[in-house]
């Protein structure tokens, strides 16, 4: 309104000046009149430009990067991408799809990338505190034959997750994930707190950070595009209440390292206090432009018996351990677009006591290996991938794992923020040579399945937000 009044006033001034000039000085030249008109018209144009900028500022809730790669939004509450990028069609930019191992470091790294984007835009950082929500819904159906030879079909709402990321200030942030799992019952409910932790760190200013809470400790990597859990994850992934001290470089080629201590889940006969477990992880991520990238690394954990796979099988009814068994993990991935290769190896460093986990009349020393190759392409215009996987275990009968696992799988993003996956899996069980007959004998129901194989076809649909 003010700008309109000013423009109107200037218009009146122009009219008044012209009439006065023409009336009082008939001898004034046309050139002088033209100069005055041009000067006043320039003032009017400048005011109109300012008025237009003010209107645009009020209408635009965000600004776009010059490279059209991200959006800046100052809202304190949002749903969707952690970085305000132009959303990825497959939902890979959503918090729900941040890998759960080393989750604290990855979230801090994303926060650093957001700050870099803001600096490139020349805009201030988002206001704090800020909250970002994300999650997924998952349905699954399968048909196959079991080790026993029976055939069955299954339809299941196989999972749901609701994640919340909170950034209190540039140095302190937190994360929690509520899960629904039809196969896990916690305190009478299938909804439970899967992960929850607080992070202290700012990778833009300092490469070290710390976190405390319930996490998947940084042992192993378990990368896969299969529906079925890799045998390495089934053997080694460990969820615990831990405190972590980490080091994380930024950039395309970055070193990372973590040292953590956690509250153990098994009681050790030789120790009165079992809250003294620990582990470490060191890795290196590299990238050579958009075509080649990958990661290599190694992990150590002081007690493999605390893994989810061991807790759900060998130590389901008995948390007493004669002696703890440490484990080592080695992992690597290499992407040479459009092909991605993944490999990982998990191994106990010594045998369990025969009374805890046995194999062929002796203490078991379980190991697991997983490898897969994926090829990305488009089905019509939809991002897709096809892959093959192979898993092998040794002395892992007591953990309920097959000796060999073969998989073929296909993924396609039919709609934005969705994924449809189809998988065929063939498992080959251990032979009867794995039986223990003396101390801690192999259960009869396990013996009945030895030397057999199964086949399962699974379809799964995920919706991310």
From Swiss-Prot:
Residues 28-60 form a coiled coil. Keywords: Coiled coil, Signal. Residues 1-23 form the signal peptide. It comes from the Bacteria. Belongs to the UPF0422 family. This is UPF0422 protein CBU_0937. The lineage of its organism: Bacteria, Pseudomonadati, Pseudomonadota, Gammaproteobacteria, Legionellales.
């Amino acid at each position: 309104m003010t700008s309109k009044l000013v423009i109107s006033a200037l218009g009146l001034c122009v009219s008044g000046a012209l009439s006065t000039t023409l009336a009082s000085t008939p001898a004034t030249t046309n050139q002088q009149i033209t100069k005055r008109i041009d000067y006043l018209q320039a003032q009017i144009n400048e005011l109109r430009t300012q008025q237009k900028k003010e209107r645009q500022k009020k209408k635009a809730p965000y600004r776009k990067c010059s490279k059209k790669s991200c959006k800046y939004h100052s809202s304190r509450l949002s749903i969707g991408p952690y970085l305000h990028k132009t959303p990825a069609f497959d939902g890979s930019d959503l918090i729900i799809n941040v890998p759960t191992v080393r989750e604290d470091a990855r979230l801090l790294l994303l926060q650093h990338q957001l700050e870099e984007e803001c600096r490139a835009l020349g805009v201030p950082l988002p206001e704090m505190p800020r909250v970002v929500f994300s999650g997924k819904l998952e349905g699954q159906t399968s048909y196959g034959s079991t080790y026993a030879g029976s055939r069955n079909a299954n339809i299941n709402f196989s999972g749901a997750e609701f994640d919340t990321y909170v950034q209190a200030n540039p140095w302190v942030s937190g994360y929690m994930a509520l899960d629904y799992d039809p196969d896990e019952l916690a305190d009478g409910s299938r909804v439970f707190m899967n992960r929850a932790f607080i992070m202290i760190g700012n990778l833009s200013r300092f490469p070290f950070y710390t976190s405390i809470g319930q996490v998947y400790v940084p042992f192993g990597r378990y990368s896969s595009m299969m529906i079925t859990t890799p045998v390495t994850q089934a053997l080694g992934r460990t969820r615990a209440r831990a405190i972590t001290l980490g080091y994380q470089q930024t950039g395309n080629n970055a070193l990372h390292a973590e040292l953590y201590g956690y509250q153990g889940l098994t009681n050790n006969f030789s120790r009165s206090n079992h809250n003294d477990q620990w582990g470490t992880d060191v890795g290196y991520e590299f990238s050579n432009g958009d075509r080649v990238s990958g990661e290599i690394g190694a992990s150590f954990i002081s007690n493999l018996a605390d893994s989810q796979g061991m807790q759900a099988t060998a130590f389901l009814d008995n948390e007493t351990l004669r002696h703890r068994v440490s484990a080592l993990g080695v992992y690597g991935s290499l992407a040479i677009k459009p092909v991605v290769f993944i490999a990982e190896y998990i191994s106990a460093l010594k045998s369990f006591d025969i009374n805890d986990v046995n194999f062929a009349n002796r203490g078991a020393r379980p190991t697991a290996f997983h490898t897969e190759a994926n090829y990305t392409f488009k089905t019509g215009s939809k991002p897709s991938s096809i892959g093959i996987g192979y898993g092998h275990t040794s002395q892992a009968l007591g953990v309920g794992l097959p000796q060999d696992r073969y998989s073929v799988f296909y993924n396609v993003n039919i709609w934005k923020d969705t994924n449809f996956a189809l998988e065929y899996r063939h498992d080959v069980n251990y032979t009867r040579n794995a039986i223990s007959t003396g101390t801690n004998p192999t259960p009869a129901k396990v013996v009945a399945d030895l030397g057999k194989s199964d086949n399962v076809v699974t379809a799964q649909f995920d919706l991310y937000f």
